[in-house]
Amino acid sequence: MNIFFLDKDPKIAAQMQCDKHVVKMILETAQMLSTAARAQGHDIGYKSAYPNHPMTLWVNKSPHNYAWAIIHAFELCEEYTKRYNKIHKTKKIIRDLYEICNGDYAKMTDPPKCMPDEYKTDDYVQSYRNYYEGDKKRFARYTNRGTPEFMQ
């Protein structure tokens, strides 16, 4: 479980993810959003999963964090369609989860840095970029999308 904060803008962060993560992180993010929604009393989305994971706790911490994550999940779905010319089946669940969103993603709190200490800096975006370049570059491919500058 993780969210890769490769940019402060949830759309750009989705566009910067490699093919493997565009596919995988849609489901993981929907699971975190579903867990947060269920913790707030909503019976929607997937069953709760990893409720005590630092990133799931962050998503549930404020409506603004939830808003960032839901927009990011939607943008990952858009990225999936751009790269593979298909619609990810989780997109419907993400739309349902969006219905309870009442936050402003610009007011989100700093997310946890779920990565080895060697990649961490004071800036969470730089930390996630360090982690991505240092640990994910070996398998990173970008179908129908240019490689982000920090990965070159």
Go through the PLM ranges and name each one.
Residues 1-52, 56-152:
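Sequence termini and other peripheral, non-core segments
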